[in-house]
Every structure is written in C-alpha cells, then in structure tokens.
Amino acid sequence: MNIRPDQNRLVFSADTLKIDEAAEADRIVAGLRAQLRSLRKRGLVLGLSGGIDSSVSVALAVRAVGAKNVFCLFMPENDSDPESLRLGRLVAETFGVEAVVEDIGPTLDAMGCYQRRDAFIRELVPDYGPGWASKIVIANALEGDGYNISSLVVQDPEGKQTKLRMPPSVYLGIVAATNMKQRTRKQIEYYHADRLNFAVLGTPNRLEYDQGFFVKNGDGAADVKPIAHLYKSQVYALAGHLGIPEEIRRRPPTTDTYSLEQTQEEFYFSLPYDRMDLCLFGLNNGLSADEVGRAANLGVAQVKRVWADIAAKRKATRYLHLGPQLVQPVEEIE
C-alpha cells in the first residue's frame, strides 16, 4: 500500500482491500469449527449454485470438517441456467463432497410460483405465456438522484424485448412469487441438515449481506455465514488461494432466478462488484467521495449517488436482518 508522506495515511485503491488469503482462510476455518462445536453439529449442508460465493464456502467447509462431513445440494428449477448445475458439479468433484440434485421445479409449480408470477406480468403484458421470458432490472444509480426504480423486461417468442415500468403492486407480486424459489431451497437444505445433524451454511458476501440482497427465511436463513465479512473482491482473491476452478472465477456474478439472463448489477447493485466494494469500503471507513472516486474511476457526484443508494437499501432491508420481534423479552432465554 502507498503512504502519503504529507498526511501519513494510506492512498485508497483496490489494493487497500487486499487480504492475506492463507491467514484469512485459516481464520474462517477455525471460526467454523468453533461455531459447529457451539451448535453441537457434525458437519455442514449448503446449496451449491456454481457461483463464486458458494464455491468458496464449499472449499472452506471441507477444510473445516473434511469432505465426508459436507453435504451439497443442486436445486435447479424451471428458469435455471443449465450452466449453474454443470459448474456446481465441477466444484463438488473438485473438493470431493457428496452432492445430490433436488429439482424444485415441480414443487414450485404445485405451489403456483410460476402461475402467480405470470398473472402479475399479464397485468402489463396480456399476451405473456409459454415461450415468453422476463426479468426485473433497475435504473442506473449513477445517472440521477433518488431511488432506483425497477422495470420489467419481457421477451416474446420471436426474441423481441420490451421494457416496462411497473406499478408497486405488480413489482411486489412478481418478487413475492419469485421468493418462493429461495424459500423452497432453504426448506430442502434444512431437511438434509436435520437428518444428518449438520448445520446449514449460508453464503452471502459482505456486499450482499450489507445491502440486503437475500430473501428473508430463504437464502438469508442459515446457522453460519462464514464469508459475510468479506467484500466480494476479497472472496475472489480467496477463491484463487483455495483452488476454485478458473472457469468459475471468470464467470460474472448472476442471479439465475429469472427466465431471462440477468446480472446482479442490472438487478440490484449500481455498479460491478469491484467498484461497489470500493464505494462500500469508503463509506464504511469515512473516506471522502473524492478519494473513493479516484479509486473507483467515478466522479464525486456519482460516488455520492452510490452512497445514497447504499443508505436507502440499508434502510429498506433492515427488517431482513431482524428476528421475530417480541412485545416483551423472555429473559430466561435471552
């Protein structure tokens, strides 16, 4: 890291977020072992998506408890990208863990997940049906002040895409139906955790955890979350140290939730993860917008817009981090 001689402080850059990967891996492994002892659990269960976060989490879990005590699940559904299953299997083979496929498509169909979602979409696009695809996108936070308004993108069977503004009722309805996917996956994870006497491992990184990029009682539910303190760029650095296949390390982060291909950037975050990390770190550590802007290649006004978006998401998603609220504390179990 570079030091400013005149101010005796660090020059902020991407290097500021660098970690000692070996030491950090050892620290997380020790933490996982201690948490499992406290929970009185024998091993770890997690969903394996083929993304960087779950892949790194598998590698850390194997180091902590051994491959025979790690149980992984592939849980595709009707809208899943087949690449996710292929890459997930690659990770499972790389680290020698037991992994099974639990196709949740029929369960979601039986619960009306897809039908409920499509009914809300048809309020805007009456012809929406078989052969169509869709996703939700947000406006670019760098291009204006205020909230990031979500839009619906639909693609007809001929491949023509149309972008539409959604009234709140349609947005909430689509999201509510889609959240069934994450909650169904978590039910299956806990089924296997219960039968094995294992703990469920959650895989959010710091950016996702801070910004509420998870579903309450869905992918947000877990017994341990070993990488929630790491910025996304730090997770990628750890992936290299842990031997995550290069193909996965090169893959852009995706949601793999909607039927149209969708990046995390267009769905939720204002910027690519590496620049979001710099903005979040700068905000968390009291750096100036000018310092962050030079590191992230953004203007001061743009940094301030990103910070406003971070603050808005923290406020809007605070309830996701809360447990059930009691009228009066039950002191004996506090």
Swiss-Prot record:
According to its UniProt record, this protein's enzyme class is: ligase
Residues given in the record as ATP binding sites: G47, L48, S49, G50, G51, I52, D53, S54, T203, K232, T254
What Pfam family is a match for this entry? NAD_synthase
Listed under catalytic activity are: deamido-NAD(+) + NH4(+) + ATP = AMP + diphosphate + NAD(+) + H(+)
Q: Which HAMAP family match?
A: NadE_ammonia_dep
- PANTHER family (UniProt xref): GLUTAMINE-DEPENDENT NAD(+) SYNTHETASE, NH 3 /GLUTAMINE-DEPENDENT NAD + SYNTHETASE
Q: What is this protein called?
A: NH(3)-dependent NAD(+) synthetase
- Biological classification of the source: Bacteria, Pseudomonadati, Pseudomonadota, Alphaproteobacteria, Hyphomicrobiales
